[in-house]
Amino acid sequence: LDATTQAILRRWAEEMVLGMRHFVVASPRGIRIADVDEFHLYCYYVAGTVGHLLTDLWHHHSTSIDARVYTRLLEDCEPFGEALQSVNILKDIAWDAERENAIYVPRDLLAAQGSAQERILDPASRPANRAALAPLMHIAQDDIERSLRYIEHLPLMAVRIRLFCLLP
């Protein structure tokens, strides 16, 4: 890999690792998210950094992503990366709780509905827990809308990049 590519990879890998260290140290037995701000921070470190990484790599390696396009992509690169993460958090609540001992639904959202992270899988708490998810659904929807805008800013000539972004 050329020196610029190595520097890009190093920069964003370090950002991700240092950020994730905070969550692992704070909750060594399983991640617990306190509030919506911390939810955003978690999503940034685990996925927003990937949005930056890809954007920087594409700018460096693709002749169709000039400075003007790059500037526009930077506006939405974090939600581009975070969209899949926010959707996966919503989709995998039970799996994360049972297998990873991780609760990404913020404590304050659950408390506002009369529930708690300890009751995330309790059938009796299901209505309260579902109500607590509404703000996270809005976050995911916003991330998806902004990620689509990100893809729209990619040049039509960047076919492989556009396909990478659109196809799982």
For each of these PLM feature ranges, what is it?
Residues 1-83, 90, 94-168:
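Catalytic cores of Mg2+-dependent Asp-rich isoprenoid enzymes
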